[in-house]
Design a protein with these regions (language model features):
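Short alpha-helical segments that sit at the start of domains
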Residues: 1-12
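Short helix-to-turn junction characteristic of helix-turn-helix DNA-binding domains
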Residues: 13-17
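Short acidic, hydrophobic short linear motifs in intrinsically disordered regions
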Residues: 18-28
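Short amphipathic alpha-helical interaction segments
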Residues: 30-45
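A short, conserved structural fragment
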Residues: 44-55
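Accessory beta->alpha helical hairpin/"wing" motif in late/C-terminal subdomains of nucleic-acid enzymes
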Residues: 53-69
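Exposed, interaction-prone assembly regions rather than primary DNA-binding/catalytic cores
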Residues: 74-159
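N-terminal, charged low-complexity regulatory/assembly segments
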Residues: 163-171
């Protein structure tokens, strides 16, 4: 069974170079090496990493992210809090949708810049990732758009995610 950190690792592998190491991933995504190592094993067992290679099976990853992630990791919302905006409240979805005036979904973070409704991230280091790696942060917010958005938000998030995954596969 995949875990939230597996999705974070998978997304990072999709946008990074093929010369990654567990140590470099640890430094980039703020997930301990032991957790990354176990995550890589689960990703390989799930057929998302090609056996014995450092390549993501992009077709399977896209299928997982677009069709299954919302069921595997249903949104867990909390109360009003300060945090980092996600889903439709963050780039790139924010640029495609009109502001509804409601409190936005945020990953709880005391250093966050926005007041909104807490949304538990796929992995606890998501707010830190958003400060370190804008490209990965965008993929995580698109994934959250798929997890928590209505049909319109999900449709736009799926389209943007597919475009980014397609360009990552071509690189």
């Amino acid at each position: 069974m995949l875990k939230g950190e597996d999705i974070v690792v998978l997304l990072r592998l999709m946008i990074g170079s093929s010369s990654w190491t567990v140590r470099s991933l640890d430094a980039e995504i703020a997930i301990p090496r032991s957790v990354i190592q176990r995550s890589l094993v689960r990703l390989e067992q799930a057929g998302l990493l090609e056996n014995g290679r450092r390549r993501v099976n992009v077709g399977r990853a896209e299928e997982l992210l677009v069709h299954a992630v919302k069921y595997m990791f249903p949104p867990v919302r909390g109360g009003e809090t300060r945090g980092v905006p996600t889903a439709w409240a963050a780039t790139p979805l924010r640029d495609k949708l009109a502001d509804s005036g409601e409190l936005p979904p945020v990953w709880p973070d005391p250093m966050g810049s926005v007041r909104g409704i807490a949304l538990e991230p796929l992995y606890g280091s998501a707010p830190e990732i958003s400060r370190r790696d804008p490209a990965l942060s965008e993929l995580l917010t698109l994934t959250d758009g798929i997890r928590v958005g209505d049909a319109r938000v999900r449709g736009i998030a799926e389209e943007l995610l597919r475009a980014r995954l397609g360009s990552a596969a071509a690189a």
